[in-house]
């Protein structure tokens, strides 16, 4: 049989393994890479369990996280896969967004069923906006009783439904260890799992498809030409002579026109998501714009002062606070390119928050920031990061 030709133009999807410790997340990741490397050797390489388990440390928003990145291809897609071996690493990754997921494989051991961390991971996936979860029911080679497997599957579906995930999501029976050992029956189940990923995880919306948004990093004046702002385009596409709105930090927004777009001292007709661009804005003075504002497509974004966030508070060892904080705590919230002071309201029944905790809080900022659900922020005291969070709900 002729081999399928691999195309480099496949859709790219970010995926990850989640689930309780010792249920086989890392073994499942290793099995996927091995089985796909055996089936499509020209496009994949196999990653051993040890290589994934000894995850290198990464720093994201001042927080150290152990996380492994592997990649692989199916016939339909190219996947980047993250595996955070430790429970604390998983939580930190989800909240800081070191690796965002378009979908997740929830690994549940058939021998145990859903455990406390299984629940916690699914809840967190909901809070941080993972769009889709499907299930790998692992260690099925160790369970002979069909009825027991059905029972565990029902429990997992109930758990997904509780958090508003797809109750009808694929649940694929696997044995990651047997697949790694080369057992053909179980290798085929891993292929079935990947086919389920291809078919059930929706294609992610590309950043370029969203309305234009660029945070302002720097502002300077070019004599005789006007005011130039620089920054990295976060979303969308901007064309020369487009009208834009300048939002956030100040009471009023203002509109202007982009009369020149430059990148690396070259003139461009467009700037798109990911570009570091310099925009010349018509009729604006240097003092009309400041760092921390955003330049955006008019009418698409609104600044807010009150929101709820899911936050990870750094432990002392991670360079965080040495002491707990209480209600009405007033740190700085760093959004995109600037710090804004905010007042923290803790949930009812929570007296204080300890370094190393994961907490939901309500925040009132002293200046408005253009935000939507999912926007990430750091919590800082005197320029030092003490926490990381994500906007879960906008209140005002």
UniProtKB/Swiss-Prot annotation:
Enumerate the catalysed reactions.
GTP + H2O = GDP + phosphate + H(+)
**Where in this protein does the record put region G1?**
19-26
Binding locations of Mg(2+): 26
Gene3D superfamilies named among the record's database cross-references: P-loop containing nucleotide triphosphate hydrolases (3.40.50.300), Translation factors (2.40.30.10)
Q: Which GO terms describe its cellular component?
A: cytosol
Binding of GTP, residues = 19-26, 83-87, 138-141
Q: What is its EC number?
A: 3.6.5.3
Q: What class of enzyme is it?
A: hydrolase
Domain tr-type G: start-end pairs: 10-205
Q: Which cysteines are joined by disulfide bonds?
A: none
Question: Which residues lie within the region annotated G5?
Answer: 175-177
Please list where the region (G4) is annotated: 138-141
Q: Which Pfam families match?
A: GTP_EFTU (PF00009), GTP_EFTU_D2 (PF03144), GTP_EFTU_D3 (PF03143)
Which segments carry the region annotation G2? 62-66
Subcellular localization is given as: Cytoplasm
Cross-referenced InterPro entries, in alphabetical order? EF-Tu_GTP-bd, EF-Tu_GTPase, EFTu-like_2, EFTU_2, G_TR_CS, P-loop_NTPase, Small_GTP-bd, T_Tr_GTP-bd_dom
Q: Report residue spans for region: G3.
A: 83-86
Molecular functions (GO terms)? GTP binding; GTPase activity; translation elongation factor activity
Spell out the family assignment given in the record's similarity comment. Answer: Belongs to the TRAFAC class translation factor GTPase superfamily. Classic translation factor GTPase family. EF-Tu/EF-1A subfamily.
Instruction: Spell out the subunit comment.
Output: Monomer.
Q: Which HAMAP family match?
A: EF_Tu_B
Protein name in UniProt: Elongation factor Tu
What organism does the UniProt record list as the source?
Answer: Corynebacterium jeikeium (strain K411)
Which gene is annotated as encoding this protein in its UniProt record? Answer: tuf
């Amino acid at each position: 049989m002729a081999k399928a030709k691999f195309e480099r133009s496949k859709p790219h999807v970010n995926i990850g393994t989640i689930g309780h410790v010792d249920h086989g997340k890392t073994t499942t990741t290793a099995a996927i890479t091995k089985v796909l490397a055996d089936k499509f050797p020209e496009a994949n390489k196999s990653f051993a369990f040890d290589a994934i388990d000894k995850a290198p440390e990464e720093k994201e928003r001042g927080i150290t996280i152990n996380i492994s990145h592997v990649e692989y291809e199916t016939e339909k897609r190219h996947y980047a896969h993250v595996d955070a071996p430790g429970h604390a690493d998983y939580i930190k990754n989800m909240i800081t967004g070191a690796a965002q997921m378009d979908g997740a494989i929830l690994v549940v051991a058939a021998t145990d069923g859903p455990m406390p961390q299984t629940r916690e991971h699914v809840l967190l996936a909901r809070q941080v906006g993972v769009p889709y979860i499907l299930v790998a029911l692992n260690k099925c080679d160790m369970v002979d009783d069909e009825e027991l497997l059905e029972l565990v599957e029902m429990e997992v579906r109930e758990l997904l439904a509780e958090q508003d995930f797809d109750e009808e999501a694929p649940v694929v029976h696997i044995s990651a260890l047997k697949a790694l050992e080369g057992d053909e029956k179980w290798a085929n189940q891993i292929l079935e799992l990947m086919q389920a990923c291809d078919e059930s995880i929706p294609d992610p919306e590309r950043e370029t498809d969203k309305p234009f948004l660029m945070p302002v990093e720097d502002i300077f004046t070019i004599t005789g030409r006007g005011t130039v702002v620089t920054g990295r385009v976060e979303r969308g596409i901007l064309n020369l002579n487009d009208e834009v709105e300048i939002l956030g930090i100040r009471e009023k927004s203002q509109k202007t026109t982009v009369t020149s777009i430059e990148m690396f001292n070259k003139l461009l007709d467009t700037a798109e998501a990911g570009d570091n661009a310099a925009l010349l804005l018509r009729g604006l003075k240097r003092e009309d714009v400041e760092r921390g504002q955003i330049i955006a497509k008019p009418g698409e974004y609104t600044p807010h002062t009150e929101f709820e966030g899911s936050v990870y508070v750094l432990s002392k060892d991670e360079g965080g606070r040495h002491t707990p904080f209480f209600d009405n705590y007033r740190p700085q919230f760093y959004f995109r390119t600037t710090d804004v002071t905010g007042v923290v309201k803790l949930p009812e029944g929570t007296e204080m928050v300890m370094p190393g905790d994961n907490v939901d809080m309500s925040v009132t900022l002293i200046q408005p920031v253009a935000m939507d659900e999912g926007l990430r922020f750091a919590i800082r005291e005197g320029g030092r990061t003490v926490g990381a969070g994500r906007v879960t709900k906008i209140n005002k």
